[in-house]
Amino acid sequence: MFGDEAEFPQLGVNLFVLAPGDPMGMYHWEADQEDFLVLAGEALLIVEGEERPLQQWDLVHCPAGTKHIILGAGNGPCVVLAIGAREHQNGAGWGGYTVDDAALRHGAGATEETTDPLVAYAPVPRREATRYREGWLPGA
């Protein structure tokens, strides 16, 4: 399910571990719905230009077209489970990156409207996948 070939091509599942201040990605909207569950720690949601604090077990539902991004917050790492539909994942019409003052203040915003991830992520260093580390999840 987490490999190159999706067992369920209509569903995407990702686990993010974010240090305080680290964004999950860039402020964007998608043509498909997404859901996020904070498994541990604290996070900051920027949704439709507004900042909202999140804590463990908070669930966020973003209907299609909702502009959003999540960042790590608090004093330590947070763990966020992201689940989303993948019907429009590839090709034209997937969504886009929009300019937002709150997202830019946190280093999580594109500087121009675009649908091209190479443009939106140009100033961001490439992220490397890592294995689970002891202590990331509560009670582990």
Language-model regions, residue ranges each:
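Short beta-strand His + acidic residue motifs that chelate non-heme Fe in jelly-roll/DSBH
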Residues: 26, 45-46, 62, 68-74
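Double-stranded beta-helix
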Residues: 69-140
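Surface-exposed, flexible loop/turn segments at secondary-structure boundaries
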Residues: 43, 51, 68, 88
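A short glycine-rich, His/Asp/Glu-containing loop-to-beta-strand
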Residues: 1-28, 32, 140
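Short, conserved beta-strand element in jelly-roll/cupin
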Residues: 15-20, 29-46, 84-87
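Short acidic-glycine-tyrosine-enriched beta hairpin
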Residues: 35, 49-65
